Amino acid sequence: MQVIPNTLNFQVIVDYAHTPDALEQVLSALRPHVTGSLVTVFGCGGDRDCEKRQVMGRIACTLSDRVVVTSDNPRSEDPLQIMRDVELGCSGQYTLESDRDQAIALAISEASGGDCVLIAGKGHEDYQLIEGERLHFSDADQANKALAGRVTT
């Protein structure tokens, strides 16, 4: 778990939680420490266990106040199909945003006092696997970029 320092009145956390159990554990651990909304940004990997997608959607939507479902190493699969699979488990307030950079920016732009934005699934990884290519991507870097775009009022 990596806390992204910022001067705003909310937390941003990057975590590697990429399995149903890990996602449930991190959300359950964070919940008692969040006075505002718990917002989760996550996706499921492509060419991997399809059965966990709906389960992870249910866990995220049950334990979070808001969820942004996004892309996470789609590999050779269509990211939109992976997100639709996740969506089968979702209810409540959730958004689909296939561009992970935009998903992180959206969650951070909407965060307010006491909130916690959890960016789950990649953790320390600094790449996305898309159609056979390994492209540089860091959740922490994207979170810092989104935070830099926020103006304290």
Feature roles, as predicted:
Residues 2-153:
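ATP-dependent carboxylate-amine ligase
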